UniProtKB/Swiss-Prot annotation:
GO biological process: translation
A Pfam family the protein falls into: Ribosomal_L29
UniProt keyword annotations, A-Z: Ribonucleoprotein, Ribosomal protein
Entry superkingdom: Bacteria
A GO cellular-component term linked to this record: cytosolic large ribosomal subunit
Amino acid composition bias (Basic residues), ranges on this chain: 73-94
Protein family (similarity comment): Belongs to the universal ribosomal protein uL29 family.
Gene Ontology MF annotations: structural constituent of ribosome
InterPro entries: Ribosomal_protein_uL29, Ribosomal_uL29, Ribosomal_uL29_sf
Name of the protein in its database record: Large ribosomal subunit protein uL29
Source organism of this protein record: Leptospira interrogans serogroup Icterohaemorrhagiae serovar Lai (strain 56601)
Length: 94
């Protein structure tokens, strides 16, 4: 499916598509790894791309619903970095 069509899906439909794609990926990897009976190995990479698209759409909707969430993630990352630098400089002194 194209990304435009995927964006038109409801949240529940995205979850269903995601679950279905993960099942297909699991079965394809099994067939390719164990039995070597997979007719088209490209199915694996295409399915992984579809899962990535679905997860991206899901995350975009999550950020639209909570616009402040992204800022808090960036802030906490900077805060951790500052804390780690302080800890490393304290080790170097002591």
């Amino acid at each position: 499916m194209k990304k435009i069509k995927l964006q038109e899906l409801k949240d529940s439909e995205i979850l269903e598509q995601l679950e279905e794609a993960r099942k297909v990926l699991r079965n394809s990897r099994f067939q390719y790894g164990v039995a070597r009976s997979l007719e088209n190995p490209k199915i694996i990479s295409n399915t992984k791309k579809k899962i990535a698209k679905l997860l991206t759409i899901q995350r975009e909707r999550q950020l639209k619903a909570n616009p402040g969430e992204r800022k808090s993630r960036v802030f906490s990352r900077a805060k951790r970095k500052k804390k780690n630098l302080a800890r490393l400089s304290a080790k170097a002194k002591g």
